[in-house]
Amino acid sequence: FTVFITGASSGIGAALAQEYAQKGAVVGLVGRRREVLEEVRARMNHPQNHEIYAADVTVETELHDAARAFIAKHGAPDVVIAAAGISVGTWTEYYEDLAHIRRVFETNVFAMASTFHPFIAPMKAARKGALVGIASVAGIRGLPGSEAYCASKAAVISYCESLRGELRDSGISVLTISPGYVATPLTAKN
């Protein structure tokens, strides 16, 4: 059983990596900070079985190189989880916040598509696999000062719903997880 997880250095991604390792999966851990990924891997069952890929999910070539390396070693994974995400308080009235809004969408939405893309063809060939997008209940209701995060998670919900329809006859499942508040390093900053 193999699992590829972005955002694996902390929060939901790290927790899922540990949970899957406990159940015997081989896990590919993706995050920007190699040293933090190594700490996560050290806490996992059978750390030598898991792969580390230091990559920024907003840099497609880095992400696709990680995906190709995982596929070359383990084949198409059983599960791909796009858990990388950021949240920055934003107010649209402030010009400088427009760049923050763009960065939130690049990480939370566009990187999810980039995460899933390299796995679709091999999963189709295998006629199995699951693509999992981490959304949020914040994608259902907007919150003042959180418009970038809320809108990005609403986009994730719609994107995954659309992708589910696109892949419905392929053997690939597309799942959306919309957790409520979870105490993570991300939420601690908000």
Which residues fall in each region the model found?
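Conserved glycine-rich cofactor-binding loop
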Residues: 9-10
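Active-site helix of classical SDR
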Residues: 116, 152
